[in-house]
Amino acid sequence: HLLLTTIAAVVLVGCATMQSQEKTPKVEPPSISIHKAASIGDIEAVRQHLAAGTDPNLKYPVVNPPLLFAVGYEIMTLLVENGADVNDIGWGMTALHRFADPKSVRYLVDKVADVNAIDKFGDTPLHKMVEGYLWQQKESVEILIAAGADVNALNFDGMTPLDNFLTNHIAAPRQAKLKREFENLLRKHGAKTSEELRPLDKEKAE
């Protein structure tokens, strides 16, 4: 009797487990691709993809992973928290080249994003950052420098971040003060133009 009771209990448990599994519906990915969902800010579609097991670093049918298409902080962090590689270069840039707002930059740095990674032009995130709108980028630049960004890295054209800044910001008179303050910020951390670096390189060689 004890044996029969034990067998019956095992059978009942097995049936209950099978019924439980049958009741749990399989999550299907949405019809929209995870790359498209990330690029248009459809966070629910991105969540559905991740729940369905879509690779957060998927590069098919495009070369870039979803992270480099992400619009906004929420989708960016959702992807990273689910395994997106913050240092994936894709077709020529990393997430730090893509996101410029201080909140995103700080988050990526905390996730050990490479602050000196180069894109397809040899630009570091700092090269790209100083090309943007000055009043938005100052804090982000300071975060990158504090995290170890090379203020005198040379891109493939032999330009430093300061070269990039001076080339891209031929400021209108009303922005002259802001431009001067931003240049002073870079120089305070040792930034130089490639022209200014040449005498230093010559001295080191001698």
Each model region followed by its residue ranges:
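Bacterial N-terminal signal peptides that target proteins for export
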Residues: H1-L4
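C-terminal motif of bacterial Sec signal peptides marking the signal peptidase cleavage site
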Residues: V13-G14
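Ankyrin-repeat boundary/"N-cap" motif
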Residues: K26-K36, L58-V71, I89-A100, I118-E131, ...
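Alpha-helical segment of the N-proximal tetratricopeptide repeat
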Residues: S33-A45
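Ankyrin repeat structural motif
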Residues: D42-L50, G72-E81, D101-D110, L134-A146, ...
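Alpha-helical protein-protein interaction modules
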Residues: K111, S140-V141, I145-A149, F156-D163
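Short, solvent-exposed mixed-charge patches
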Residues: K204-E206
